[in-house]
Amino acid sequence: MTKTITPSSQGLDQKWYVIDATDQRLGRLACEVAKILRGKNKPTYTPHMDTGDFVIIINADKVAVTGRKSTQKLYRRHSGRPGGMKIETFEKLQQRIPERIIEKAVKGMLPKNALGRQLFTKLKVYPGPNHPHQAQKPEELTLNTIPNGDK
């Protein structure tokens, strides 16, 4: 009889990946990043454990959306005070805080519990091409989020 083996937390090797978001589609990029953060790309995937890897996303200010989403997609936040709702379009948020767009997209694709919050801390997003994680020796990961290979 075979038994299911649960990996120990010490035996997991967590890699670092760097992904360039230039001209990548937002939703497709976020989906792939969420899979890597959860560890679904590994044979040791366990739903209740953090078996995923660290992901660094660079050039977050150059992420693309299709159609009219740049003017119609809205991001809402609330201060907690009466009348404190702030609404911002994709374009304005991309000019102001471009990394928040990718963070919100990926966070929405992670579990809504303590594990999801822990996984989210392994995502590092930077608006430009530079990041401070060279010491971790991240691997370059190329994702093709453009359907039919356009561009």
From Swiss-Prot:
Q: What CDD domains has UniProt attached to this entry?
A: Ribosomal_L13
Sorted alphabetically, which InterPro entries does this protein's record hold? Ribosomal_uL13, Ribosomal_uL13_bac-type, Ribosomal_uL13_CS, Ribosomal_uL13_sf
Bias kind Polar residues: ranges: 142-151
Any one GO molecular function term: structural constituent of ribosome
- Provide the Gene Ontology terms for cellular component: cytosolic large ribosomal subunit
The record's section on PROSITE patterns has: RIBOSOMAL_L13 (PS00783)
Keyword terms: Ribonucleoprotein, Ribosomal protein
* Biological process (GO), any one: translation
Ranges for region Disordered: 126-151
Q: Which NCBIfam families match?
A: rplM_bact
Q: How does it assemble?
A: Part of the 50S ribosomal subunit.
Give the family from UniProt: Belongs to the universal ribosomal protein uL13 family.
Which PANTHER family does the entry mention?
Answer: LARGE RIBOSOMAL SUBUNIT PROTEIN UL13M (PTHR11545:SF2), RIBOSOMAL PROTEIN L13 (PTHR11545)
Q: Per its database record, what is this protein's job?
A: This protein is one of the early assembly proteins of the 50S ribosomal subunit, although it is not seen to bind rRNA by itself. It is important during the early stages of 50S assembly.
Q: What is this protein called?
A: Large ribosomal subunit protein uL13
User: Origin organism of this chain?
Assistant: Crocosphaera subtropica (strain ATCC 51142 / BH68)
